[in-house]
Amino acid sequence: MAGSGSWDGSQSDNSSQFEPGIDNIYEAFICPLTKQVMHNPVTLENGQTFEREAIEKWFQECRENGQPLSCPITSKELSITDLSPSIALRNTIEEWRARNDALKLDIARQSLYLGNAETNILLALKNVREICRNIRKIRQRVCNPQLVRLITDMLKSSSHEVRCKALQTLQVVVEGDEESKAIVAEGDTVRTIVKFLSQEPSKGREAAVSVLFELSKSEALCEKIGSIHGAIILLVGLTSSKSENVSTVEKADKTLTNLERSEENVRQMAINGRLQPLLAKLLEGSPETKVSMAFYLGVLALNNDVKVIVAQTVGSSLIDLMRTRDMSQREAALGALNNISSFEGSAKLLINTGILPPLIKDLFYVGPNQLPIRLKEVSATILANIVNIGYDFDKVPVGPHHQTLVSEEIVENLLQLTSNTGPEIQGKLLAVLVGLTSCPNSVINVVSAIRNSAAIISLVQFVEIHENDDLRLASIKLLHNISPHMSEELANALRSTVGQLGSLVSIISENTPTITEEQAAAAGLLAELPERDLVLTMRLLREGAFEKIISKIVGIRQGEIRGIRFERTFLEGLVSILARITFALTKETDATLFCCEKNLPSLFLDLLQSNSQDNIQRASATALENLSLESKNLTKIPELPPPTYCVSIFSCLSKPPVVLGICKIHQGICSVRESFCLVEGQAVDKLVDLLDHENDKVVGPALAALSTLLEDGLDVVQGVRLIDEADGITPILNVLLENRTENLRIRAVWMVERILRIEEIAREVGEEQNVTAALVDAFQNADFRTRQIAEKALRHIDKIPNFSGIFTNIG
């Protein structure tokens, strides 16, 4: 008898002689070279028998060593090296092996129950694996339903080792055996195996993946595996794991590849981040498969990076589907394109791939095979997504005659389509126009088309829509975008209709949990309307708009109204709207009374200190200028008592009566609330601080507000003294010297001339050559009136003699 040995990594057949109930191995069955039971015995000319593979290897080694071919047993040289198959011996061995396998399987069946000792179970599982491997070698198979079910029962063991070996055994049993796979697929066994992907140690996970890989080779089982909750996400997770061994990762990947035969599995993979199979089917599948995949791509949640990948991979194919005459293909393609067009990166790729021409054609085409309205709405949505990325659309042709998206003809068609469709598509078309008007390069084209088509009235009417929030929002955003270019037309439209102005006010004043985009857009729209439009201002006053706006401003300033995203733009709009009432003070008593009642000067003084909010500071300074200009009309001049007889006789010797509380500037009794006095409101310091602002649009209004203290009819000397006390002289001179804009220079020259009327200031400033140079430049190059004022300023510092005036003096 030959001893036991190792063969092919598993326990050899000769070990069976030590197991109870197993036939002993006959010595004739053993190959002298391998010491293993032979599978393909062959005989030499001298009658010695060997395993074919082993003796062929022996002969090869003899040749490589330059030795004559000899018998490994007798060491004698062979004259003939032909190998004769030992058919009878092979049949005998196979019969012996089949008999022993049957006995081993019977013992295994008896050992495979959960109450048995772990060692017995493990031995039984090992024997089953050996038998199955041997059967594979002789290209036979065995299907023992009872045994397969007993092995699956071992998956319920409390022992990790038993469960792992049971999985390894199942993998060997089902390999290439469809019947065994079908038995494993019964009941919840596959679900249990899937569970092991996350709950077992590393070896157990590898064994579970190996079983699933074998099962997934059966097309009939692909859907069953994929239908188990968590199966695909766990497999996808394993493929990207950095901690799993390479074998587990590779088997998981191969399993998923097999599962791709089911479209539902492909969808599940896409949901869980493995999108490539879906894209591959969309590119290479049948027309029906392409439609199915495109439909699913349209509803799939995608992050922005994935949208770019999708656009790169299948963007062209989707556009081709969109161009077909098949309505289901077009619908599926539009849905997918809608999904991936909402990110700037993917939208640019789609533009470069040529999406715009067919998209525009689908929107405007009327005739056979035209898109139904519901799909035109999707087309409009895609177009809205694309135009909101801020692309140079004037360089992308979309029509047969090289029209672009911002060509007047195309924009007018969009406007016409907006008027002739339902609310859903109207909202999308308006969103397209919002995108186009958000770009400085294209807004002028849209404004021109709106003017030429007289569409402003119909656009304003959308403001009153209450049944469709998206439509109303899009219309307000569009009107806001065009308002800087069409403020007069918008004001006329709002004046000539009933309800729209009130609707905008209602939106602004609505009590919402946070500030909405619609509120910010509505406020921005009203803020752009002509500020000197008295009719519009008084309508706002009568409708209670200003009171509501004050409430909103105070609420935001006190932190009672929040909305980080839109708070700044909303507040800017509110302050600008409120400031317009100060333009009505000279003509409307009601406006003056409202400003007094609500103490608007104090509110604007508070807003003046809104650091880093230029538009709010600009509007507040402008409002304070208007309020201050009205102070001289509101100041109460005290009545002096009539002089006594003696005083009237000796008036040259008497002193004028002293009245306490007289304003130095307005020579009357002032207050910030009732007469809008900047001095009483302690506004001078705050306005002077803004003169150093980097934004010219803030400096100008601040300078204008300060200049109201130097107006004719006021005590200019006292006004200059107040500005000097606030250290405002130098900043004013700096505005003159910097010469940022012509308007700032005109205002600065006017103020400097008044300041230089103070003799000691004139002496000091006269020594500053740069100031003199700036005044000389204004004297030579500014407009006529400013040149006159600059001449007077130069006289104050003795740079022009009094007898050398060349202009008519002005008061």
Curated annotation (Swiss-Prot):
Q: Which regions does the record annotate with the repeat ARM?
A: 136-175, 178-217, 220-261, 263-302, 303-342, 344-388, 399-438, 444-484, 489-528
Per its UniProt entry, what is the enzyme's top EC class, as one word? Answer: transferase
Q: Transmembrane segments in this chain: where?
A: none
Q: What is its EC number?
A: 2.3.2.27
Give the protein's recorded name.
U-box domain-containing protein 43
Task: Report disulfide bridges, numbered on this chain.
Answer: none
Q: Name one GO cellular component term.
A: mitochondrion
Q: Which GO terms describe its biological process?
A: protein ubiquitination
Query: Mind telling me which CDD domains this protein's record contains?
Result: RING-Ubox_PUB
**What GO MF annotations does this protein's record show?**
ubiquitin-protein transferase activity
Specify the species: Arabidopsis thaliana
Source domain of life is: Eukaryota
The catalysed reaction is: S-ubiquitinyl-[E2 ubiquitin-conjugating enzyme]-L-cysteine + [acceptor protein]-L-lysine = [E2 ubiquitin-conjugating enzyme]-L-cysteine + N(6)-ubiquitinyl-[acceptor protein]-L-lysine
Tell me yes or no: is Repeat among this UniProt entry's keywords: yes
Q: Which InterPro entries match?
A: ARM-like, ARM-type_fold, Armadillo, RING-Ubox_PUB, U-box_domain_protein, Ubox_domain, Znf_RING/FYVE/PHD
